[in-house]
Amino acid sequence: MFLWERPRYLPDIRLELLADIVTFKSSFTGKTQKVTYATPNWKGTLTVSNISESQLLELKSFVDQVYKDGNIFLIKTYGHLVTANEPIALGPTGNDDFLKTVGWEPNRDIARAGDKISVNDELKVVTAPVRSDGVGSAVISISPRLRKPIAAGDTMKIITQSPKGRFHIRDIYKIKQKVDAMQKGDNIVINFFEDF
């Protein structure tokens, strides 16, 4: 699976959490209703204006690799102060918007609200400050909630340094055609969506 790391020439992908809103229309009355689901989804955006030759080569290489790898890739994030360690999440929590974790250094600040972590290639945002207790355990509130709950007796490794999320490009074939036809000076916006 291809791993998107900090690019050499291209701007980095902007990640944001979007509410999962679906609009339904009644076939009987014609009225519409919007439903917001409890779990938001990650969306990434890569915007390149007035593309240079170096950026174009890097973009073509990226799109070709994602296309070849079945349109699933990982995005690595940076710049967070989460304590380096190899903690694990214990299951089940009974509620998938927090993690019971062990393996931290005791009595340490672990993360701030807004830091990112990943659990089994699911990218999460820490929603409240986290501090470990005297035995190195901590409860981490996260968003979005876990897509795949932790089963009883199972554990999941938590990645705190350069966490990753699993994404795909909608309509990769059309994006690949567009990128292949691009020339120096062109503009493009590519959207990526969480894959789960």
Where do the protein language model's features map onto the residues?
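Extracellular/virion structural assembly segments
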Residues: 1-196
